[in-house]
Design a protein with these regions (language model features):
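Conserved catalytic-core segment of nucleotide-activated headgroup transferases in glycan assembly
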Residues: 1-61
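C-terminal alpha-helical cap of glycosyltransferases
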Residues: 165-167
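Short hydrophobic/charged patches on amphipathic alpha-helices used for structural packing
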Residues: 63-66
Length: 167
């Protein structure tokens, strides 16, 4: 899968290693295959992440897919190809997305959405800074309160933002 490349796996694995209570939920149509799920789990295992910290799921209808967001605290963006629809859906479901400024259009999609909402502080300068931001959130005692507030307000913030301005 081109979005979850080795650099992305390495960054996410570092977050998981440094935030022992964190888990990763990853969904993709290619994960329908048990072989592909095992391959992904093996890539994380090579980097020191136990398989029980990963939840991997394959295709799901849109309603079920949106329900997965209820199990997530913070969405982690891919790079160099960012989310587009998934970034919008995460924000719509009340989740901040951690991303960073990339060097091409396809790696700046998420940051352009976040900068048009109240989530500009979730845009890091690079992959290293994004990892540090994620680890910091995992260890910050105020994070649950911050995330609860965002979960309640992000849909309205997004709807009122430039990102949804149809004029």
């Amino acid at each position: 899968q081109y979005k979850v490349c080795p650099a992305v796996v390495a960054a996410w694995a570092e977050i998981l290693r440094r935030a022992p209570s964190a888990r990763l939920l990853l969904g993709n149509s290619t994960l329908k295959s048990i072989h592909n799920r095992q391959y992904v789990a093996d890539q994380f295992a090579i980097l020191g992440v136990e398989q029980d910290r990963l939840t991997l799921f394959g295709p799901a209808d849109h309603y079920r897919f949106l329900q997965y967001y209820d199990q997530i605290d913070v969405a982690l963006d891919t790079f160099p190809y960012n989310g587009g629809t998934t970034t919008m859906e995460a924000i719509w479901q009340g989740l901040p997305v951690l991303t960073f400024d990339g060097d091409r259009w396809a790696s700046r999609t998420s940051q352009s959405l976040l900068r048009r909402t109240v989530l500009e502080s979730f845009v890091a300068g690079d992959a290293r800074a994004m990892v540090e931001m994620a680890v910091g959130l995992a260890h910050d005692p105020s994070t649950p309160e911050t995330l609860a507030r965002l979960r309640r307000s992000l849909r309205q913030e997004l709807a009122a933002s430039e990102a949804c301005d149809t004029a």
